[in-house]
Amino acid sequence: MTRENLEQIAESENQRRAEFRDGINVCVATGCLASKSQMVKDALDREVANRGWEKHCQVKGVGCLGLCSEGPLVSTRSGALYKKVIAADAGDILDHAGKAPLHRLLCSTDIPFFHDQQKIVTENSGVIDPERIEDYIAAGGYSALMKALGEMTPAQVIQEVTKSGLRGRGGAGYPTGLKWSTVAKAVGTQKFVICNADEGDPHRVIEGMLIAAYAVGASEGYIYIRAEYPLAIKQLRAALPQAEQLGLLGTGICGTSFNFRIELRVGAGAYVCGEETALIASVEGKRGTPRPRPPYPAQAGLLGQPTLINNVETFASVPPIIRKGGDWYAGIGTEKSKGTKVFSLTGQIRNTGVVEVPMGISLRKMVFEIGGGIPAGRKFKAVQTGGPSGGCIPSEFLDTAVDYESLAQLGSIMGSGGMVVMDESSCMVDVAKYFMDFCMIESCGKCIPCRAGTYQMHRILSAITNMSATPEDLKMLEELCDLVKHTSLCGLGQSAPNPVVSTLKSFATEYKAHIEEHTCPAGVCGKAVGANL
C-alpha cells in the first residue's frame, strides 16, 4: 500500500458516493440499535428496492449521531436530521429525499448540543460506515500513518505527540508523549502495544495503534475488549482483516520495514481490568488482578516486555495530531489539559448522548446548554463525573472547568468520560451506596483494603439508607474512606471512596437526616432499590 494507492481508493469511494443522487444515514450504534434502528434501516433498504432506486439512493448504517435521547436517528445528505424514526416512516423519508425535509420527524440541529461541540475524535461518527475500510479511507483514514512512515522518524512522532499535550483519556491523564517515550527507550526482546477498548471507530483506533507501534518500536498489538460489547467486537473483527488485506497490518507495512500485527482479545468483563496490570494479566490468560508497581508496564508489561497501554480515545486522538500537528492540537483546551474530551452525558437531563467538547468547558455549560437542563421543572442537585469511582459535584461548583486538575480539586476524576446528572429527586446517600455496591462487586479481592473496605462501607451505607445507622457508623465510614483510598493496591480501590467522600462533604445534611431524624429528604430510601439516577 502506497500513498498513491490510498488516494486511488479514496477517489474511487468518493466517485461511488457521487453516483447516488441521495444519501440516507441510519445510526446503528448501540443506543439507537436498542431503539430498533436496525429495523428502520431494513425498512429503508426494502423501500429503496421496491422503488427501484438502488442506483439513486444510498442507505448506510453509520456510527453514533450523538443525541441518543431522540433515537433512532436518521440523517440525510441534504442536512436533515430525523428523530424517533420507526420502520413505518421509511416511505415518507424517501418521499422527501432531495426535497424539503419531513417536518414531523425533524430534529433541530441549531441547538447547543450540536453547535457547542468540537469533533476531532468523533469526526467520522455519523458519517462513515464503521465496517467499510473504503469509507474510512475516503474520510482521510490512514493518511496520518502514511505521513508518519514516509516523512517522520519514530522520535519525531513522539515529539509531535508530546508537543500536542495529549494526556491519557482513560483515567489519570498521564502525558501520552512521556509514556510513549518511556516505552521507546525501554530495553526488551520485543515490545507490545495494547488498546483498552469498549467502543470506538475501529479503523481510527487501528491507525492510532499503528502510529504508536512505529513510534515505540513494537511489533505486536492487542485490542482488549469486554464480551458485553458485541457490536464493537463485530466491527473490529471485520476491520482487522480489511487492514491486513490492504497491507496496512502485517509485514512490510506500506512498503517499509515496519511490521505490526494486532490480535483481538475478548475479556470476561471485569471492571478491574481497566487497571493496566490487571488487563495485562487477562491478556496473558490469567485471572485479571493487579500487581504492585514498579515495575511499570512501560518497563515490564506483557510477558515481562516493555508494553504501551492506552485506551481507545487516546489512540483515536493520534491520527489528527499527526495530520495537523501537535501545535494545532495544543491550541485547543486549557494550559494543562489540551484537546477535546468525549463524554457520555446521561441522567436526569433533557439531552442525553455522546458529546465531544474542548477541555475547559464549564460544567454549567455541559448541563444547562449542551444537556438542555433539567426536565419537569426540577432543580439541579449534582453531577457525577468519571464513572463509578467519580465524585458528585454540587451546584455551587457548576462554573468549574472540566479538566483534569479542576475535577481532582473537587474530589472527582475525568475517568473515561462518564457524566451523570442528578436532580432534587435523587438521594445522595442512596447514590453513594449505588456506586459503592458496584465497586464492592467489581473488587478483585486481591488486597484486603479494597476487598473488606468496600464491603464495610457498603454495609454502613445500607444501614444509613435503612435508617438504622448511628453517629458512630458515620465516623467509621469517614475513617474507612481514608483507609481504603490510601492503602488499596490499584486505582479501583483507591478511587472507590470518591462518591462517598464527595457526598459526605457536599451533602452532609442528607446523611444527618437519615441518621438523626430517620428521614430521607428526597423520599427515596425505603421506597426503591438502587439509586434514582
Language-model features and meaning:
Residues 201-215:
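Histidine-anchored nucleotide/phosphate-binding helix
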Residues 29-33, 161-183, 269-281, 285-287, ...:
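Conserved phosphate/anionic-ligand binding catalytic regions in large, soluble enzymes, centered on
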Residues 1-22, 37-61, 78-103, 138, ...:
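Ferredoxin-type iron-sulfur electron-transfer modules in oxidoreductases and energy-metabolism complexes
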Residues 48, 208-210, 360-375:
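Short amphipathic, charge-patterned alpha-helical segments
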Residues 233-359, 371:
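Hydrophobic alpha-helical positions that pack around
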Residues 101-163, 310-325:
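Flexible inter-domain linker/hinge segments
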Residues 146-187, 330-331, 336, 344, ...:
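Accessory "access/gating" subregions that flank catalytic or transport cores
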Residues 37-38, 69-75, 172-180, 233-238, ...:
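Short acidic, glycine/serine/threonine-rich loops at helix termini
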